[in-house]
Amino acid sequence: MIRKIIILMFTFFSNIHNEKIYHHKQRRKFLKGPLGYLNRNVIQKKHYNLYAKKFINYKEIQIQRINDYRKRSGVDKNNINYNLRDTYNYHETHLFVRNEVLPTLAKIENENLKEKEKNKEIFRNINDYNSNFTRQTFLQFLMDLYNIFLKIDDLFLENKTYFSILIYNGPMQLTNHLYDDIIYVSSVVENSDDVSPSEYCMEYISHLENLCEENKLSFLAHAYVFYKNFHLSKEHLLKSICKYLNIIKKLKSSTYVADVENFEFCLNKMSRKWSRWEKDNFLASLHNATNKMMILTKHFEKVKS
């Protein structure tokens, strides 16, 4: 009796399995037939054509830049034709900072790089530059940075009618971080009360004050370049100095803050009201601003006798 039941169950399930296979084969034949398109349209989901806004493929742009750089390999690798508006360098929809300010800064940096390559034999021994750099010198360097950034903020406030957007939406975090770092470094420096801002700092502050009275666009360019250059180099610079001086704690001013992004946002908004002459005046001032801010590197240029 049990044997018969098992045989019946086996036969029943085998028929079901065969029926499924037969149904699947017949369905595939039907879909391939002349009336199959009706069934396919019923079964398949609707497909919608999304006409998205055309976007810029930045990955291809980066690959193109790398390929162009490799083509310039050799002594001419840094000879870039900045007058040529390449497809990946120029976009009409971009704003003033990306269209004109950043390419100008890149051109200035490229010129400085060529000068460094010419004089690399003079600067080949880096130990000559670190011999006299002490914790007192580092504290003075931080004080110089703090006083310069503070003076820039004060000049923005004094000329509120011209720089109103920078007061409310511009940089405002870095000075607080530098102040906290000065308090900390002072605690690990002997005779820290005797350390005061350097003559280089006072000279640069005087230069900024004169510029703000004579040419506010030029002053704005100096302020932007100072913020931008410190933003790009601060993490590596401050960490390297702390490592050299055996300062264990991480400085707050070496961390990321959005001051430069806020500054560039304000520049873009201000430039909408500028004439072509005002934009060219600002761009021309970037060269002098880059050269002038290098005065603070004299802290590191004390060559041992």
From Swiss-Prot:
Q: What happens when the gene is disrupted?
A: Conditional knockdown results in severe growth defects and widespread parasite death in the third intraerythrocytic growth cycle. Impaired apicoplast development.
Question: Tell me, what is one Gene Ontology molecular-function annotation carried by this entry?
Answer: heme oxygenase (decyclizing) activity
Has UniProt tagged this entry with the keyword RNA-binding?
no
Localization terms from the record: Plastid, Apicoplast
**Residues bearing glycans:** N132, N159, N288
Post-translational modification (record): Proteolytically cleaved; targeted by its N-terminal leader sequence for import into the apicoplast where it undergoes proteolytic processing, resulting in an N-terminus starting at or near Gly-33 in the mature protein.
Keywords of this entry: Apicoplast, Glycoprotein, Heme, Iron, Metal-binding, Plastid, Signal
Extract the signal peptide range.
1-18
Q: Does the record bear Magnesium in its keywords?
A: no
Sufficient for apicoplast targeting: where is this region?
Answer: 1-83
- UniProt function note: Essential for blood-stage parasite viability. Required for apicoplast biogenesis. Associates with the apicoplast genome and mediates apicoplast gene expression. Can bind heme. Can bind protoporphyrin IX.
Q: What is this protein called?
A: Divergent heme oxygenase-like protein
Tell me what organism the protein belongs to. Plasmodium falciparum (isolate 3D7)
Tell me the name of the encoding gene. Answer: HO
